[in-house]
Amino acid sequence: AEFKSRTTAEAKFLRALYYFHLVRWFENVPLMTAPLTNPSAYNQPQAPPQETFDQIAKDLTEAMQDLPKRTMKANGGHATYWSASAMLARVYLFCKGYYGTDLNAGGTVIDAAKIRTYLDEIINSGPFSLVPVYADIWKKANEMGTESVWEVSHSSLALLSGSTSNQHQAQGNYNVLYFAPRGIA
């Protein structure tokens, strides 16, 4: 039961993350929260942005209930309570800043005071701290380090497909190597 609830929470976190990207890029997107079981249902109408933002908030607040309060490293790179609450804050700031509205997470209003509570908890109670030397953030030893609330893990061992186009490569850590400050990575 614990595995199922945690896995469902991780799926809700990822759905919220993906919808956050979609709604920022395209604004009106089809909002699907259940599997499509019939081909006639494939043509879904676009949802207004506020409806999508509210679903994102609902997914994140529900996910927070079943995600562990561990660091990314201790949780094997999976979503955590901390990453969901930080993501909710980011979503709120975008929605409030761009649309001027609060979020509604299934009947619970998410406003600035609630977000402040989550951020204070991350800063004061979370297992996070700044790395003393900024340049050390980019070192392999600090992957999923004390500054990491949410991080996508990559491997430098990924094999390239032989293509010279980045579009067709398994990039691994190459972006970090290309774009990190010189002499750091």
Identify the role of each PLM range.
Residues 1-79, 92-107:
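Aromatic-anchored glycine-rich loop motif in surface-exposed flexible loops
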Residues 61-62, 78-185:
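An aromatic- and glycine-enriched ligand-binding surface/loop that stacks and positions planar moieties
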